[in-house]
Every structure is written in structure tokens, then in C-alpha cells.
Amino acid sequence: MEAERRPAPGSPSEGLFADGHLILWTLCSVLLPVFITFWCSLQRSRRQLHRRDIFRKSKHGWRDTDLFSQPTYCCVCAQHILQGAFCDCCGLRVDEGCLRKADKRFQCKEIMLKNDTKVLDAMPHHWIRGNVPLCSYCMVCKQQCGCQPKLCDYRCIWCQKTVHDECMKNSLKNEKCDFGEFKNLIIPPSYLTSINQMRKDKKTDYEVLASKLGKQWTPLIILANSRSGTNMGEGLLGEFRILLNPVQVFDVTKTPPIKALQLCTLLPYYSARVLVCGGDGTVGWVLDAVDDMKIKGQEKYIPQVAVLPLGTGNDLSNTLGWGTGYAGEIPVAQVLRNVMEADGIKLDRWKVQVTNKGYYNLRKPKEFTMNNYFSVGPDALMALNFHAHREKAPSLFSSRILNKAVYLFYGTKDCLVQECKDLNKKVELELDGERVALPSLEGIIVLNIGYWGGGCRLWEGMGDETYPLARHDDGLLEVVGVYGSFHCAQIQVKLANPFRIGQAHTVRLILKCSMMPMQVDGEPWAQGPCTVTITHKTHAMMLYFSGEQTDDDISSTSDQEDIKATE
């Protein structure tokens, strides 16, 4: 009977049965990975929400990481971990399961003390165990720390000193912290506590408190753009918080410079320094905020400004000796050392006023503040095309090399098209009120600093001609002309000299007809008939680091000194 019920071999019903099995197994093989992937993503989302809830309520500055950059052990369970979370203020590292325990067990850096503490009263060390920096040495026995493959040894989160487990005695646990190598840059929590108490008592004599910290105390404020340098600023914020007081470190995308700089008003007169981590645009934003402090009558609190260049361009930072771009080639601790060694100098800032023709003077002139340069012509056209495409697809322009390749493409295109030709027929140029006759040019560039176009010394050119001395603090502008994009490229590789038009205290340019590309400090726009007037606005107090001086800087300085001697 059973044999009768079975389908005969080769019958249609047996084929259908086999096809059903095949379809079932195919569906399982397709749907099972989909189900597993969906389940894993759901669990991952739940875990992320759980972590975010802990992060939001925590006093630590927790951040996720998928892979620690060095051998790491959980500070709670002491197990070796590859991924987890770390605090970017105190450096604590834990796995995901120990987050809540770490939050309750360990205290983060306190930006100010809870009790009323005098500045003269030193703080005790704040030790955390394990994960000491590589190549660190014990402050007691001077031997290397962190050599054992386990959670061992201690680090003070303020002075960054390390000590072995066996060297950690009761006397050392109670030892006072001197804030280490960067004590002259750190704002002590006890200082802020005393300031807070003085403000309650309606006292403002902060100089008395500061004098107890020493004349060498020049507290540093970090203003970093987390979006600059392919989001490199985000990581720098955490590294600076570990080395300094977290209250000194600001993300300008969340706290505008005008608000962040109010911290300077709690510091001694003329003592504060600011390190701007970002491109030339971020530096200009900070300097505008400094000008607002002058308007408010806060001149005595104005800081000196240093630059850590991120992104592309960075001609101002190059002029001030900070290099063309930071990509982590030196540790952040060395950056702080460079800031301590830097010298104060002045930087001219200029007002660029653009008055459109027509409109019966009903429109207000557009005003810009210039730190680097103003230009009309092919370089402004390249910047305009680049910015237009970057706004459409910003994710495609996250690489410095790619950005420079795009600039090269537009420069090559303009060599063939020559959209800015016959500029001399479209504009009139006046230097200090005197009209200047122009040859057949495609571009005019007005310089305040030595570098232009991502590292080119435009005013110097090939260096084989005598030229007047150029400085960024003499109240003079250098005006040059270029014959086209190909001429710009030749100047950048020192195969040609620019057409030096002259130097002036005031520059006036009249665009008589047609639309032309213009830019101020790398911010381009298309401009119709107008009058552009450039006059001196103010000085900015900057920090110059001579340690980054290049061979070009040395040769340029020596050449100009020789010229000055012959004159």
C-alpha cells in the first residue's frame, strides 16, 4: 500500500516534490543571512541607544572606538579589549559591559573644585590605573612603565606623570600635583574656584590670584573646528582635553569664538593665548571675534593667536611659521611646546568694501575683512568653480590630494578657455589715489602676507630680481598681476616672476563692465560692475613659531636683507 502511495520514479509528482525542496532550501539560504543581518543591526542599534543614554548622563567624555590604537585593558575588569569606549578628558578605557561600573567608580577631571580652595593650595595627584602611554617612565625609579601585558601602573590625569604599581606608596598617593610640563598653559581648577568665589563677593582683582601662579603663566585656549581636515579636529579636541583643563577646549561648531573668548576675561591682562585648529577661514572667524572684544572695550584681555593648520591652503599659518598642514606628524604635546616657544607679532587686517554700481546708492556696500589676499581673475575663478562643486557633493572633497587635483583640472581648463582675458580693459586700478596703467593681464592679486595659492611666495617670484621688502605688519599691501592660469602655475614652481604693480596703503579697483570672479581669503563669488576699496582696518596679535621656518623663508629673508643693504 505504501509503495502504491509513493510517486513512481520519473512521474510529474516526484518532480514537483523535488522542486519544492529546492525552492525551500533556496529561500532558507537567502532569507537566513538577511534575518541574521537584520537581527544583528537591531541589536547594534539597541546597544548604541544604550551607550548614548550612558554617555548623555555621564560626567565622563565618553567616545566609541572600534579598535584601540595600542594594547588596551579595561580599567574595570582588567581584561584585554580591542574595542570599547574611552574618555577623551581623563583617558579612562573600558569595554561596553563595564561602562556603568566605570561611571560610578571613577571620577573624571574636574574643571573646578567644589570646595573653596586657595590658589596657593596645590591639588593632589589624580591617578588612574593602566593603559599608560608608550615609552613613559616612572617618576620614582625612572624605569619604563607599562611593559607588562596586563592592567598595571598609574598615570596622573593632570600632570601626565606615570609610576609603577610597586613604587606607588602611601606618601606618593598624597603628593601634590604640579600640573607637569604644561603647568604654564593649564588653568588650575582651584583658580576657577577662587574666581567664582570672588565674583560672588563682587571682586574683580584677578591679578592678585594670577600673581601667585607666576609670571610665566600664559593659559592657552583651544578653538578647534571639528569639521576641518577631514574631521581631524574632532580627535584633536580629545587629545587637548587630556593634556589641559577641559574648560579650555572648545569646538567652534558648537560654541562660537565670540562666546569661547569670554574665558579670557577671567584671566590676567595680556596673558591669554589661543590656538586655532582649522583652516584660514576658521582663523579669520576667530580674529573677527577678537575685534568684537575690542569694540566691547576688552582690549586688555585680547589674546595672542597661534594656528594649527587643518585642511587645504593655510597660507596664513605658513606665513606665521606653523606649516602648510597638520596631519598628526608630530604629537599634540609637541604642538603645545611650540606654542610656549612662539613669539608675539602683529598682523595687518584690512577692510574690503565692495560698492555695486547703480541701484541709486540704495544698497549698502558689502564689507569683508582680509587677512591674506584679495584677487580678481583666474585664481578666483578656480576657487569659485571648486566651491560650487563642493557645495553640491561635499563628501567627494574630503581628501587634500583630491582637492588639489580638482584645482589642477580647473586651472588647466582655464588655460584653454581664458575666461578672464583682457582684464586690463575691464578694470581701473588706483594705488594711494594714483591711477596705474596696466598691461594685458588676466588677474590682479592684492597681498597682505608672504604666501599665496597654497605655499607660493608670489611677491618674491623666482627671487632673481630686486623687489621692495614685504611685511605683514607694515601697513602696506603688495599688488601683482598675472597673465593667466599658466603664468600662475609657472610662478608656483619658480619658473616665472609676477608682474609687480607696486605697494600701497590704499588700493582701489573699479570693475567697469561684465561679471568677474573675485575672492577674499579663499571665499569666492561672481561680481558685477563695482568699486572695490581696500583700506587698513586693525592689527591682530599673532604668535610666530620660528622653528617651522623653511628654506624658502631663509633664502627670501637673506635676499631681502641684501637688497636693503645695497639700498
Swiss-Prot record:
Description of activity control: Undergoes competitive inhibition by its own product 1,2-diacyl-sn-glycero-3-phosphate/phosphatidic acid. The strongest inhibition being observed in vitro with 1-octadecanoyl-2-(5Z,8Z,11Z,14Z-eicosatetraenoyl)-sn-glycero-3-phosphate, a major intermediate in the phosphatidylinositol turnover cycle and more generally by diacylglycerols with an arachidonoyl acyl chain at the sn-2 position.
Phenotype for residue 99 to R: In a breast cancer sample; somatic mutation
Zinc finger residue extent: Phorbol-ester/DAG-type: 59-108, 124-177
Effect of residue 439 to G: Decreased diacylglycerol kinase activity toward 1-octadecanoyl-2-(5Z,8Z,11Z,14Z-eicosatetraenoyl)-sn-glycerol
Pfam short name (any one): DAGK_acc
EC number: 2.7.1.107
Reactions mediated catalytically: a 1,2-diacyl-sn-glycerol + ATP = a 1,2-diacyl-sn-glycero-3-phosphate + ADP + H(+); 1-hexadecanoyl-2-(5Z,8Z,11Z,14Z-eicosatetraenoyl)-sn-glycerol + ATP = 1-hexadecanoyl-2-(5Z,8Z,11Z,14Z-eicosatetraenoyl)-sn-glycero-3-phosphate + ADP + H(+); 1-octadecanoyl-2-(5Z,8Z,11Z,14Z-eicosatetraenoyl)-sn-glycerol + ATP = 1-octadecanoyl-2-(5Z,8Z,11Z,14Z-eicosatetraenoyl)-sn-glycero-3-phosphate + ADP + H(+); 1-eicosanoyl-2-(5Z,8Z,11Z,14Z)-eicosatetraenoyl-sn-glycerol + ATP = 1-eicosanoyl-2-(5Z,8Z,11Z,14Z)-eicosatetraenoyl-sn-glycero-3-phosphate + ADP + H(+)
Pathway info: Lipid metabolism; glycerolipid metabolism
Topology within the bilayer: Single-pass membrane protein
Protein family: Belongs to the eukaryotic diacylglycerol kinase family.
Record-given protein name: Diacylglycerol kinase epsilon
Lineage: Eukaryota, Metazoa, Chordata, Craniata, Vertebrata
Gene that this sequence comes from: DGKE
